[in-house]
Swiss-Prot record:
The lineage of its organism: Bacteria, Bacillati, Bacillota, Bacilli, Lactobacillales. Pathway: Metabolic intermediate biosynthesis; chorismate biosynthesis; chorismate from D-erythrose 4-phosphate and phosphoenolpyruvate: step 3/7. Involved in the third step of the chorismate pathway, which leads to the biosynthesis of aromatic amino acids. Catalyzes the cis-dehydration of 3-dehydroquinate (DHQ) and introduces the first double bond of the aromatic ring to yield 3-dehydroshikimate. This is 3-dehydroquinate dehydratase. Its EC number is 4.2.1.10. It is an enzyme of class 4 (lyase). Homodimer. Gene3D superfamilies: Aldolase class I. One of its GO terms (biological process) is amino acid biosynthetic process. The gene is aroD. It comes from Streptococcus pneumoniae (strain Hungary19A-6). 3-dehydroquinate binds at S6, E30, W31, R32, R62, R186, S205, Q209.
Length: 225
């Protein structure tokens, strides 16, 4: 289980002020570029990639329809992703498949896609269909984050993940039950078959995130013989 921490600067000045040494315990950095005005993203990109040079990095534009901070037309979304990919080669690129399915074909040349689905309202009844459709597309990683309201919501997602991982051992998954009741899904990633778990440093990027320090301790305990 790799631990991912998001950076969410809201300006070039905030990006330049980031102290990369505070993120050394994170295995992967996620740049949530949606916290910036869309016209500032490409201006801030050099500072982010210089700051975290040599680190694994996920480039993410989380749109409002999936719980993020930005609204982008399909053309704007694809343009920003392609520009960042061309000039900075992030290790992973998050792609909101269900929000931008109509332009997905333009991303087929990218081998490092994280195909993602986010639902901040509920754990939908068609989770099996969602996981199945994303798996068939054979991305680098399938990411599903849904809101849990009951313990059964959490158990359902964990069981679906374990089942899909068993049937597709070469496919990497990240599944998250958001919210307080879903915290257990964040610490049992290795059991359910998730490759990553998201943690927070100063600011959470999703409900129910656990601090990086706590997640590191939990991982150490779980890794003990």
């Amino acid at each position: 289980m790799k631990l991912i921490v998001s950076v969410m600067p809201r300006s070039l000045e905030e990006a330049q002020a980031l102290d990369a040494t505070r993120y050394l315990d994170a295995d992967i950095i996620e740049w949530r570029a949606d916290y910036l005005p869309k016209e500032a993203i490409l201006q801030v990109a050099p500072a982010i990639f210089e700051k975290f040079a040599g680190r694994e990095l996920v480039f993410t534009l989380r749109t409002r329809s999936e719980g993020g901070e930005i609204d982008l037309s399909p053309e704007e979304y694809i343009h920003l992703i392609k520009e960042v990919a061309q000039f900075y080669q992030p290790d992973y690129i998050d792609f909101e498949y269900y929000s931008y399915k109509d332009v997905f074909e333009e991303m087929l040349d990218f081998p490092n896609l994280v195909l993602s689905y986010h639902n901040f309202q509920e754990t939908p009844e068609n989770m099996m269909e969602i996981l199945s459709e994303l798996t068939i597309l054979n991305p680098k990683l399938v990411k599903v984050a849904v809101m849990a309201h009951t313990e059964q919501d959490v158990l359902d997602l964990m069981n679906y993940t374990r089942g899909f991982k068993t049937l597709n051992p070469e496919q990497e998954y990240v599944t998250i039950s958001m919210g307080k009741v879903g915290k257990v899904s964040r610490i049992t990633a290795d059991v359910t078959g998730s490759s990553w778990s998201f943690a927070s440093l100063d600011e959470v990027s999703a409900p129910g995130q656990i601090s990086l320090a706590s997640m590191k301790k939990i991982r150490e305990i779980l890794d003990e013989a």
